[in-house]
């Protein structure tokens, strides 16, 4: 359905096909990650909360509604974003709350390591797992990322590099 919707958008002459990005929240984020590896016509991606390594994800493995598939390898190959993210060559921003109870910042980091394109991260303190959009407490950082990536606007803050000596953290801001 995502690719079909994208086809509808790019067929509309009023829409600039070079400025279409995709975001998804929670399970929509999982679908965003899969799409990032298969539809190169999107110019940017912003998965919020969800990522790959689904069978290791607390929101999947610790819930009663999911039973482990009979053929784990085949299931991962078909349905887990880790099978697709290594083909992602567009800018992608992974966003998650540090206190998210469904998805893991660590697994999101491991998912982002698979991507070929430029990768950004937005780790938010006290961003609980919810689905609000563009407001003061919502997903304004997704809007900022898309504005920067698609329209060249300045990001509020980008960390260029970081290092730690075990006691102190040094961060270089771009």
Residue ranges and their predicted role:
Residues 1-13, 76:
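Alpha/beta-hydrolase active-site loop
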Residues 14-26:
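Alpha/beta-hydrolase fold nucleophile elbow
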Residues 22-24, 48, 95:
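Short beta-strand immediately N-terminal to the catalytic nucleophile in serine-hydrolase-like folds
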Residues 31-74, 122-126, 130-140:
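Hydrolase active-site cap/lid region
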Residues 88, 94-96, 100:
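Short beta-strand/loop motif that positions the catalytic acidic residue
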Residues 101-107:
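Conserved alpha/beta-hydrolase "acid-adjacent" motif
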